[in-house]
Amino acid sequence: MSGKGGKAGSAAKASQSRSAKAGLTFPVGRVHRLLRKGNYAQRIGSGAPVYLTAVLEYLAAEILELAGNAARDNKKTRIIPRHLQLAIRNDDELNKLLGNVTIAQGGVLPNIHQNLLPKKSSKAKASQEL
C-alpha cells in the first residue's frame, strides 16, 4: 500500500499550472508573486491573482483585436504603435481608461476643425447645377 492513501502503483497526475486550470494564457503565478512583492496588501487571496490575470488578458486581447483591425485598414500586416494609438483613441471606453497614457511613436488622431474647412458657397452649387 502506498503512503498517500491511494491505490498502490497508480501513476501520479502531472501538475497543472493555475493558468491552465483557469484557462488563461497569462501567468497567474507571476501575477500572484508581483502582488505579494508589491506591498499592495498584507495578504493576497488565492482568487485575486486569477481574476486580475483574466482582466489583463481580456484587455490585451481587446486592444490587439482593435489594433489588428487598424493595421488591416492601413493595408499592413504588422501592428505598430500607430495602430495601437488609433485603436485606443477611436474606442470610447479604452480612450477613457487610457486617457492619460502617452504611446511612443503613436502620433495623433487626424482632425481638422470645422472652421478651417472650405465653406460651401451658393455660387459653387449654382455652377454645378448648370
Curated annotation (Swiss-Prot):
Sites bearing Phosphoserine, chain numbering: S127
Motif extent ([ST]-Q motif): 127-128
Molecular function terms from GO: DNA binding; protein heterodimerization activity; structural constituent of chromatin
CDD domains reported in the protein's UniProt record: HFD_H2A (cd00074)
Record keywords, A-Z: Acetylation, Chromosome, DNA damage, DNA repair, DNA-binding, Methylation, Nucleosome core, Nucleus, Phosphoprotein
Pfam families for this protein: Histone, Histone_H2A_C
Post-translational modification: Phosphorylated to form H2AS128ph (gamma-H2A) in response to DNA double-strand breaks (DSBs) generated by exogenous genotoxic agents and by stalled replication forks. Phosphorylation is dependent on the DNA damage checkpoint kinases MEC1/ATR and TEL1/ATM, spreads on either side of a detected DSB site and may mark the surrounding chromatin for recruitment of proteins required for DNA damage signaling and repair. Acetylated by ESA1 to form H2AK4ac and H2AK7ac.
Annotated InterPro entries: Histone-fold, Histone_H2A, Histone_H2A/H2B/H3, Histone_H2A_C, Histone_H2A_CS
GO CC annotation terms, alphabetical: CENP-A containing nucleosome; nucleus
Annotated site residues (Not ubiquitinated) in this chain: K119
Entry-annotated residues carrying N6-acetyllysine: K4, K7
Keyword Nucleus: yes
Any one GO biological process: DNA repair
Subcellular location: Nucleus; Chromosome
Subunit details: The nucleosome is a histone octamer containing two molecules each of H2A, H2B, H3 and H4 assembled in one H3-H4 heterotetramer and two H2A-H2B heterodimers. The octamer wraps approximately 147 bp of DNA.
Family: Belongs to the histone H2A family.
Misc: In contrast to vertebrates and insects, its C-terminus is not monoubiquitinated.
Function: Core component of nucleosome which plays a central role in DNA double strand break (DSB) repair. Nucleosomes wrap and compact DNA into chromatin, limiting DNA accessibility to the cellular machineries which require DNA as a template. Histones thereby play a central role in transcription regulation, DNA repair, DNA replication and chromosomal stability. DNA accessibility is regulated via a complex set of post-translational modifications of histones, also called histone code, and nucleosome remodeling.
Name of the protein described by the UniProt record: Histone H2A
Source organism of the structure: Kluyveromyces lactis (strain ATCC 8585 / CBS 2359 / DSM 70799 / NBRC 1267 / NRRL Y-1140 / WM37)
Gene name in the database record: HTA1
